[in-house]
Design a protein with these regions (language model features):
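Short amphipathic alpha-helical interface segments
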Residues: 1-22, 62-64, 68
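Short, amphipathic alpha-helical interaction segments positioned at domain boundaries
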Residues: 51-69
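A short, conserved structural fragment
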Residues: 33-42
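Short, hydrophobic-biased segments on the C-terminal half of alpha helices
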Residues: 25-29
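Minor-groove-contacting beta-hairpin "wing" of winged helix-turn-helix DNA-binding domains
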Residues: 44-49
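Generic leucine side-chain signal with a strong bias for well-ordered alpha-helical environments
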Residues: 9-13, 31, 57
Length: 69
């Protein structure tokens, strides 16, 4: 899966899109395989449940903000 697709899916998760009804269900499940989870709290925070997921989530968030600037 490309970084571009991962970042798009991450952005959609950040804005609360329902992952169960998403057209890229397989890709989102792939992200979940890395341990990505969404925490439903006021801060819209993310967590990763595996070591690889933590590293990948950190990398994607950094990459996402680089593209914003």
């Amino acid at each position: 899966m490309s970084d571009e697709l991962k970042m798009r899916l991450l952005k959609e998760l950040m804005f609360g899109k329902d992952v169960c009804d998403h057209e890229h269900h397989e890709e989102i499940m792939f992200l979940h395989d890395f341990g990505f989870v969404k925490l439903y709290d006021d801060n819209m925070q993310f967590a990763a449940t595996t070591e690889h997921g933590i590293e990948e989530l950190s990398r994607l968030i950094k990459l996402y903000f680089v593209f914003l600037n």
